[in-house]
């Protein structure tokens, strides 16, 4: 299993900035449909996104399409075996579904769906644990870029980028009022969204 580092992850994001810009432009003329929700999880079918998918399917009208966006062919097969409407998140279909969906449910980040088409969607960030450690803006490790020096200007630019991305989160449910301030601080969110 590959290990994740923020330095490498941030480097990939910096290199993909043109794709983020093109994706953001593509979202401008598109009307998002309240009859389309997309779901994804950074570790595959599961986490909080799967129970929410099932609850939404049990309570929303059939006219609302719920789609699991899979990160691999194996995940796609698992999702379909579980009876979920599923597509690959990368590629044109995943981009178009994310682009048109009003609600985007994620557990790790925007990359759980198609990261380039999230602007303008209502992102529900379910996260994937209890924030006992420092996260995102509160952790110096988060603000590093592997191919750039660990300099205050680099960290400031990354912090600004993380704050900007955090503004794309519409709702961040937490387990208790005790952890809410950590999430507000870590993601640069207004308390009203947590």
Predicted regions and their residues:
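Membrane-proximal basic amphipathic "stem/tether" segments
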Residues: 1-36, 145-156, 160, 169
């Amino acid at each position: 299993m590959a290990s994740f580092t923020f330095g490498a992850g941030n480097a990939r994001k910096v290199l993909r900035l043109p794709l983020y810009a093109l994706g953001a432009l593509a979202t401008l003329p598109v009307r998002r449909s309240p009859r389309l929700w997309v779901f994804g999880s950074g570790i595959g079918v599961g986490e909080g996104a799967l129970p929410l998918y099932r609850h939404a399917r049990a309570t929303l009208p059939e006219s609302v399409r719920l789609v699991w966006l899979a990160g691999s062919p194996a995940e796609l097969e698992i999702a379909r075996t579980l009876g979920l409407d599923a597509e690959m998140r990368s590629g044109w279909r995943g981009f178009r579904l994310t682009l048109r969906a009003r609600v985007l449910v994620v557990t790790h980040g925007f990359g759980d769906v198609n990261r380039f088409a999230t602007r303008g969607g209502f992102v529900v960030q379910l996260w994937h644990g209890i924030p006992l450690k420092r996260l995102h803006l509160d952790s110096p490790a988060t603000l590093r870029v592997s191919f750039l020096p660990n300099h205050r200007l680099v960290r400031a630019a990354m912090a600004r980028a993380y704050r900007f991305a955090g503004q794309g989160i519409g709702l961040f449910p937490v387990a208790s009022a005790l952890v809410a301030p950590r999430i507000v601080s870590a993601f640069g969110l207004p308390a009203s969204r947590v």
